[in-house]
């Protein structure tokens, strides 16, 4: 199994897709990397030579922030926003959507499951 920047690439997938398993590398970056190294996007990960793996590793490590470094940077950015108390930081602290989505309905994935609030009982009919 081909291993690149700490991630096992799926052997059966085309390189264009397999590279997206690396955090911080999407389809566009994968294609840019393959074009810069001169490797065909249609090639399967199992068919990579050691030389091509080294080329890919060097290109990704020198040109992009990926995996642990990127995760740390994102976490630090969020922590900084929370500390300075800006609007986005407050939304992070409260566990609400940060980018302007509505919260009157929906937003359940960010807010968690519904917490039912006890209310007044309706009087029964006779």
From Swiss-Prot:
Disordered: annotated span: 95-126
Superkingdom, natural source: Bacteria
GO BP term, example: translation
Function: Located at the top of the head of the 30S subunit, it contacts several helices of the 16S rRNA. In the 70S ribosome it contacts the 23S rRNA (bridge B1a) and protein L5 of the 50S subunit (bridge B1b), connecting the 2 subunits; these bridges are implicated in subunit movement. Contacts the tRNAs in the A and P-sites.
Subunit structure: Part of the 30S ribosomal subunit. Forms a loose heterodimer with protein S19. Forms two bridges to the 50S subunit in the 70S ribosome.
Record family assignment: Belongs to the universal ribosomal protein uS13 family.
PANTHER family: 30S RIBOSOMAL PROTEIN S13/40S RIBOSOMAL PROTEIN S18, SMALL RIBOSOMAL SUBUNIT PROTEIN US13M
HAMAP family from the UniProt entry: Ribosomal_uS13
Protein name: Small ribosomal subunit protein uS13
Organism lineage: Bacteria, Bacillati, Actinomycetota, Actinomycetes, Micromonosporales
Gene name tied to this protein: rpsM
């Amino acid at each position: 199994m081909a291993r690149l920047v700490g991630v096992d690439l799926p052997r059966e997938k085309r390189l264009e897709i397999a590279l997206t398993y690396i955090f911080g590398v999407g389809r566009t970056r994968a294609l840019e990397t393959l074009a810069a190294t001169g490797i065909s996007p249609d090639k399967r990960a199992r068919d990579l030579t050691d030389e091509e793996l080294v080329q890919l590793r060097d290109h990704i490590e020198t040109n992009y922030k990926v995996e642990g470094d990127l995760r740390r940077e994102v976490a630090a950015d969020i922590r900084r926003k929370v500390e300075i108390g800006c609007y986005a930081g407050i939304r992070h602290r409260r566990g609400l959507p940060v980018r302007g989505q509505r919260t009157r309905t929906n937003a359940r994935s960010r807010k968690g499951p519904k917490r039912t609030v006890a209310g007044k009982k309706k009087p029964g009919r006779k």
